[in-house]
């Protein structure tokens, strides 16, 4: 229960960091009420990279939320220590959610940051499964920072890759609906592999694939460019804007 409650904190922190960027986005609709349709978004490779980055980093996050404590129990930790390690990892996502937007804003593009965060989150989680027991606590710190940074960066990229608020709204919908459907497969596959192998070591291959794919999607989504989507000005929308 504590882990589930703590998971809401990074989201609030990321929203606080993301809101000023969204409010400064060019072409913000009058009063923020009317979002116009856009054309070409689902045909744009950059938009799909943002979507995949959102979904893949979420898959890693769901694996942490759902399976980190059982993974640690499998390593021989008792329930209390496994819960404390998991809580530490999730708590550190708060700091990462606050600091990542600052770091990302200072970068010419966010490709390198995306790769570093994906590597930190993935390798630390794999290390907690395969590495020595004494390394579990420091690896939990690294994992939390990497995972929280990925979440904040995924939200930031929606705004940074959008030319205006209309495109940002549709890109957000695309990234979060399609992305979260993809994300749901992560914990499910971890469970299937555990049932098949009888331990979590078999899941490290899946985690490695998720990490590499997250880094590749982040490298593509992090380049300094805008998605190619055109706002469609319909008569009804124009009348609504005028009102």
Give each language-model segment a name:
Residues 112-126:
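Structural signature of the two symmetry-related core transmembrane helices
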Residues 96-109:
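Helix-to-loop junctions at the C-terminal end of transmembrane segments
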Residues 162-201, 206-207, 218:
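A late C-terminal transmembrane helix in Major Facilitator Superfamily
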Residues 28-33, 160, 220-243:
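Intrinsic disorder in cytosolic terminal tails and internal cytosolic loops
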Residues 149-163:
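Intracellular juxtamembrane helix-capping segments at the cytosolic ends
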Residues 1-23:
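Helix-loop-helix hairpin linking two adjacent transmembrane segments in secondary transporters
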Residues 44-97:
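Extracytoplasmic gate region of multi-pass secondary transporters
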Residues 21-50, 239:
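Juxtamembrane intracellular "pre-TM" segments in multi-pass secondary transporters
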